[in-house]
């Protein structure tokens, strides 16, 4: 009789992880993916509603939604595994950043000389005198 009770306990300990795994695969795992796809659909619909208001200047001709790639919610890992590190990208792509003209960089370069010292009292163009504020600075 003791041997029979031992078999049931052993069977129960073997069946519990199997039931837990089945429950996880059938109930827990599909729910985040379904809700994520519903949210992506809502975001795409919202972006399509905004596109006619913005006009054709957006240039989104390839049909891909940028909301899916930009939202951090869709970059999370599902389950209890390790999270994939999220690589932060700049808002402006590198190619467009090189094409943009930044006035701030030019004014900062005028305020400092080649050695990183500030130029005080510059009153003319850059070729007037190349010193730190007056003509008789050094020699």
UniProtKB/Swiss-Prot annotation:
It is found in: Secreted. InterPro entries: Gastrin/cholecystokinin_CS (IPR013152), Sulfakinin (IPR013259). Residues 1-35 form the signal peptide. Residues 36-71, 81-109 form a propeptide. Keywords: Amidation, Cleavage on pair of basic residues, Hormone, Neuropeptide, Secreted, Signal, Sulfation. One of its GO terms (biological process) is neuropeptide signaling pathway. One of its GO terms (molecular function) is hormone activity. The modification Phenylalanine amide is found at residues 80, 120, 137. GO terms for cellular component: extracellular region. The modification Sulfotyrosine is found at residues 115, 132. Drosulfakinin-0 (DSK 0) plays diverse biological roles including regulating gut muscle contraction in adults but not in larvae. Belongs to the gastrin/cholecystokinin family. This is Drosulfakinins. It comes from Drosophila pseudoobscura pseudoobscura (Fruit fly). The lineage of its organism: Eukaryota, Metazoa, Ecdysozoa, Arthropoda, Hexapoda.
């Amino acid at each position: 009789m003791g041997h029979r009770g031992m078999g049931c306990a052993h069977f129960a300990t073997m069946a519990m992880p199997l039931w837990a795994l089945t429950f996880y695969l059938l109930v827990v795992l599909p729910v985040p993916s379904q809700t994520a796809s519903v949210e992506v659909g809502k975001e795409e619909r919202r972006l399509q509603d905004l596109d006619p208001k913005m006009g054709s200047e957006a240039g989104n001709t390839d049909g891909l939604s940028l909301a899916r790639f930009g939202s951090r919610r869709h970059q999370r890992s599902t389950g209890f595994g390790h999270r994939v590190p999220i690589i932060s990208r700049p808002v402006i792509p590198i190619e467009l950043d090189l094409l943009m003209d930044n006035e701030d960089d030019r004014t900062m370069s005028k305020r400092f000389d080649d050695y990183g010292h500030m130029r005080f009292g510059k009153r003319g163009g850059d070729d007037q005198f190349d010193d730190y504020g007056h003509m008789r600075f050094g020699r």
